[in-house]
Regions:
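Intrinsically disordered, low-complexity terminal regions enriched in Ser/Thr/Pro/Gly
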Residues: 1-174
Length: 174
């Protein structure tokens, strides 16, 4: 019997951050609130969050669900009574597509945030979903982002390319 022994030193730095924190955004194809399927590998905090590994939504998968966890809401470093949560969606050109805000109570130290977005009318493109948490009184904030794709071949985008020949013509000929 052949074997090889490898010894290596590994330094692990524990995550001991005492201020506001947020997990990565998990995008999902399906989310079941209050799931009783606690043995599922997709079970988290009473939700069954079924991932979508290719991150492609649109005609065949019209709804994107998201799941994220927020930590240390009761940190002494935070000054505001509420933490502002901004959910922002950008297209591949950086254009703001949608924005929504809400205030998060600090009555518990951790919380789960979930939501959904219908994408059946979005044109084919790549998008970035950003969640930002802001403590306005201490002027601090954190954010996390997730890129995903929408494929909707039936949605025709009006060309937004604008031209202005007037300035060029007048400078050349005027």
């Amino acid at each position: 019997e052949m074997f090889k022994e490898i010894k290596e030193k590994l330094k692990i730095t524990p995550y001991l951050n005492k201020t506001l924190g947020i997990s990565d955004i998990q995008l999902a194809s399906k989310m079941i609130q209050g799931s009783e399927n606690t043995s599922s590998i997709f079970y988290k905090n009473t939700y069954e969050v079924v991932p979508i590994p290719n991150l492609v939504f649109g005609k065949s998968q019209p709804v994107a669900f998201f799941y994220t966890e927020i930590y240390n809401l009761q940190s002494q470093l935070l000054k505001s009574e509420f933490i502002k949560m901004r959910m922002i969606l950008y297209n591949s050109k950086g254009k703001l597509i949608k924005e929504k805000s809400k205030n998060l109570s600090r009555n518990s130290n951790t919380r789960v945030e979930v939501g959904s977005q219908i994408l059946s009318n979005f044109p084919t493109d790549s998008y970035t979903f950003v969640i930002a948490l802001i403590d306005s009184l201490s002027s601090t904030g954190i954010s996390t982002a997730k890129k995903f794709f929408v494929y909707n071949p039936d949605i025709v985008v009006a060309d937004t390319f604008e031209t202005s020949t007037t300035a060029v013509l007048s400078s050349t000929f005027g």
